[in-house]
Amino acid sequence: MNDALSIGPFTIPFTTLMAAAALAAAYIYIRYGTDFQKEKYKKIREEGLNILAAGIIVFLFGTVLLRLPAFFSDPLAVLSYPGGAEEMLLAAAVMMIYSVIQVKKHALDGAALFRVIFTMFIAAELIYHFFQPSAGDSTGSLLPFAAHPVSFYIITVGGIVLYWIHHKKGSLEQMVLPAVVIWAFSRWLIGFFDTVHTFFMVPVPGAYFWIPAAGAVFLYVFQRINKKQVTAWKS
């Protein structure tokens, strides 16, 4: 059975299609299952979706930028090359820069925007692993199952984090920062029970899971600086 969909010269792995479907389902969850369904958050939802779409496009086609010489010599081969850890890092950088630009341009609540994007990723990963379960390294004779149920671990952590984000009321540092740090540490730790650290089945260095935590800290500092500038301007 083929594990990829061929459209002309392009080859799209089914795991990528499943990830896209999971992200779409996660947006529906944001739109109808959270407090972001309110009309006052419409712009936040739209920009969150735009930023996510930009990240997906960069992940799928970032290989062109990373391998320009090869692209000029054999463009079809490069375009059919699946995205990996480097493309994912490039996508994260583009999403972070795009987020800052949109926050400044539209005077958006940066914490709310980060929460929307982070929630979509966590919900999507939970959905993805529910339908695409994976097992990790052997457990030996210590546990009743032969291999670590990595997907179960990820779903459990994702469920706890989603509950925290949507039921814990408070400021950015009280609500989002702890959730991001808990998720980053847990996903980094889970990787040691798997054959390799992965995100949506894409092998990545374990340090990649700390990127959202770094982004949350950057956002917190950015928000504080903005507030001080506004306060100084008003006084």
Regions found by a protein language model. Give the residues of each.
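Hydrophobic, membrane-interfacing alpha helices
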Residues: 1-235
